[in-house]
């Protein structure tokens, strides 16, 4: 049964690499990159329409633009969404880390992004697929 797919990912994530780590050099397990994974699910669900929306950073504390990719079809309910946070690390958008509060965490995770709330975007996506009963 097809399932909807939602992903938010920083392009400079040094924990879960955007381009993947098939050879498991990072020790987190082998995995494909986001471009291949998103395309796999779009193809698997026969999603023949897509759009790319560029969202310029408007936050004061970050300069991370967002590229929103949406794949869908008029023939089925499934969709695939990807929020690509440009130059961002392993962080949850809407959550901010100030470097002076925790320099080590800021170094590894990035400063965050306040242009979107990941929690709100996740809910907006998945509430479309709720069924009655």
Model-identified regions with their sequence ranges:
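Alpha/beta-hydrolase-fold serine-hydrolase catalytic core, especially in secreted/extracellular enzymes
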Residues: 2-3, 35-133
């Amino acid at each position: 049964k097809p399932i909807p797919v939602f992903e938010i990912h920083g392009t400079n994530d040094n924990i879960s690499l955007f381009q993947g780590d098939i050879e498991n050099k990072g020790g987190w397990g082998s995995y494909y990159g986001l471009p291949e994974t998103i395309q796999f699910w779009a193809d698997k669900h026969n999603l023949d329409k897509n759009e790319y929306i560029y969202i310029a950073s408007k936050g004061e504390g970050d300069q991370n633009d967002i590229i929103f990719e949406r794949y869908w079809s008029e023939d089925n309910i499934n969709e695939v969404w990807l929020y690509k946070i440009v130059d961002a690390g392993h962080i949850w958008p809407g959550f901010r880390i100030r470097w002076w509060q925790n320099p080590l965490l800021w170094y590894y995770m990035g400063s965050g992004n306040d242009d979107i709330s990941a929690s709100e975007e996740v809910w907006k996506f998945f509430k479309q697929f709720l069924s009655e009963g």
